């Protein structure tokens, strides 16, 4: 297996395990508690990740089944590499700048189900399986269109990097929520 892909799959597995350990025991009330009206709850962080990741699953399926069609945007030289690097850098948790989620990927505003962490872990297994299934492909040369914005393109490998860095960013955001003064005590 490609070493970089193996590392990303391992990191995705760690995120799933850590999510289960850190947030799996939270009550529905705790999952839905928001530090401020304009801030996300733990549940919303994971709802957002699931919504975002679900946009990638059919794209990866199309690649695996040979149904991927190249768009005009994907054929522009240098654009996929530029977009990939830009998104990976901007989504890195070390970047203090907040980024507004695209409308299609905003989390639910109502109560999030108490099963959100288990649902995320289950979806993460699907994501990891899809990643493994592409191990024999040239992931740097396969260009996909972002599920968030049609003109944005990047390699499938960069898509995997984006998924993992995005998950780390929102995992840390969820950690900050439970560390916030006023977070409800467990039962």
Language model features with spans:
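Amphipathic alpha-helices that form helix-helix packing interfaces
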Residues: 15, 19-22, 56, 120-123, ...
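AMP-dependent adenylate-forming
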Residues: 29-34
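A short, mixed-charge helix-start or loop-turn motif at secondary-structure junctions
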Residues: 1-5, 109, 149-156
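Extreme N-terminal tail/first-helix region
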Residues: 1-17
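Short, contiguous alpha-helical
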Residues: 35-88, 125-133, 137-187
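Acidic/histidine-rich alpha-helical segments that form the ligand environment
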Residues: 82-139
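Short secondary-structure junctions
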Residues: 25-27, 134
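Active-site rim elements
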Residues: 5-6, 43, 113-114, 159-160
